[in-house]
Amino acid sequence: MKVLITGGAGFLGRRLAAKLLQRGTLKNAELREEKIEQITLFDMVPALGFNDPRINVVTGDVNDPEALAKVIDTETTSVFHLAAVVSSQAEDDFDLGLSVNIDASRRLFETCRKVGHCPKVIFASSLAVYGGALPE
């Protein structure tokens, strides 16, 4: 089983990778435990702190279709999509927020669709998606 973690150098990406390495298996599409052969950590900066032959660190832009095609192939079975621009940065640079959080996600989903089988995609978000307090 090959696993991809976008945002792999971030806090959640590194924690998830460490937990997956510790477990050593993940459920496949048939809900059977399968051995994890490789975890690719894909991010704008290298993911540091791993000394395990199952870890493959790839730097690149989640907005780049060619970079996505290099990390999502016919052997990719699971994609944890954690790459995102956080709310405060997205509020300061609205175009960047749209580009990464919407356009890049769509490109990632499209790349998964094009590989001939559809890898399982797990998308994470945060409490920030709910916005602020509701008006009275």
What would you call each of these model-derived segments?
Residues 6, 42, 79-85, 121-127:
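SDR active-site strand-loop-helix element
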Residues 46-54:
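Short loop/helix-cap segments at secondary-structure boundaries that form the rim of catalytic
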Residues 59-100, 132:
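NAD(P)H-binding glycine-rich loop region in Rossmannoid oxidoreductase-like domains
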Residues 1-29:
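N-terminal Rossmann NAD(P)H-binding glycine-rich loop of SDR-like oxidoreductase domains
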Residues 106-136:
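Conserved Rossmann-fold NAD(P)-dependent oxidoreductase catalytic core, especially the SDR/UDP-sugar
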Residues 40, 45-46, 63:
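Adenine-nucleotide cofactor-binding loop residues
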Residues 55, 76-77, 119:
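Conserved acidic residues
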Residues 22-42:
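Short mixed-charge
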